[in-house]
From Swiss-Prot:
This is ATPase family AAA domain-containing protein 3C. Keywords: ATP-binding, Nucleotide-binding. Transmembrane segments: none annotated. It comes from Homo sapiens (Human). ATP binds at G177, P178, P179, G180, T181, G182, K183, T184. GO terms for molecular function: ATP binding; ATP hydrolysis activity. The gene is ATAD3C. It comes from the Eukaryota. The keyword Plastid does not apply.
Amino acid sequence: MSKDALNLAQMQEQTLQLEQQSKLKQLVNEDLRKQEESVQKHHQTFLESIRAAGTLFGEGFRAFVTDRDKVTATVAGLTLLAVGVYSAKNATAVTGRYIEARLGKPSLVRETSRITVLEALRHPIQQVSRRLLSRPQDVLEGVVLSPSLEARVRDIAIMTRNIKKNRGLYRHILLYGPPGTGKTLFAKKLALHSGMDYAIMTGGDVAPMGREGVTAMHKLFDWANTSRRGLLLFVDEADAFLRKRATEKISEDLRATLNAFLYRTGQHSNKFMLILASCHPEQFDWAINACIDVMVHFDLPGQEERARLVRMYLNEYVLKPATEGKRRLKLAQFDYGRKCLEIARLTEGMSCRKIAQLAVSWQATAYASKDGVLTEAMMDACVQDFVQQHQQMMRWLKGERPGPEDEQPSS
């Protein structure tokens, strides 16, 4: 009896499981059917949307094409839009070139008194006040030359200033002579005396530019022509790139740059004045010589000029700092006038720059001392050292063999 009851219970349990599985399958099938219906509805809705959009676009396009006024207005609008975009692009480029030509400093310019955009943004008050408070300076202020050369450069300064006042054509000048004789300083003073801007470039910067040299040269003169005050363009070491094209071995890029320079300086201008400085003017191309109006020789200072230079630099680098008391520097008591004359006699053959370096060495020697006092003996030691260095440099320059004190003992 119990066995039949157990079998009956098992059969009922199996029946219940089958019923549950059947219901579960029905639920799964119902979910699948609903999902399939949802996908079909979404697909049908998407297709209907595409058909409606296509119909709407087609009808709109058909209406647009058949309406001549709308077509004309659209074409005109697109044309104006294209012209506007093209004009804006080119106007931006032109504006950039204009700003660069007017205010940007060319890559060849090492130093200039013209106000650049960067300097104006960094120090606007300082730049404006410098321009408003600037006054013409004496062309020979801080420049020591022989009496004949002083008269010559003063005449040039008067001529240049009057040319600027009367808006005449500037003359091209060649300053030649040994290095350190005051050519660059005179060019700066000439610009300030005449109320002009100045720009300094060096000939050694041209050759490394290669193919960019021609473009840089044209940018330089385009920039020079925009100066309202007139520009004095000073080319230091001009012989570095203005060499003879017929005999010198120069690259094609440098030759093209030289041709561009000759083209821009072939005629006189009321916008810029050209000053060339060279230690070897005999190396110039003949076309450069034809462009030069005035030649001025800056020679080494004589004994009288050296005495003036020694006094000037002694005052600038030693006496003035010592009297101000702001630095650790004092000067012993001795006859300064006699010492300046003695030093002028010993420094024969030295340039203005060398004498300035000698005065700087006096200052450095005083700073190196324990008490900061520059004595006469310390000055004499510096002078003797500079004289020996100058003699050695002259031996190198002349190609002479070193003296007995420099020769090595034979083995």
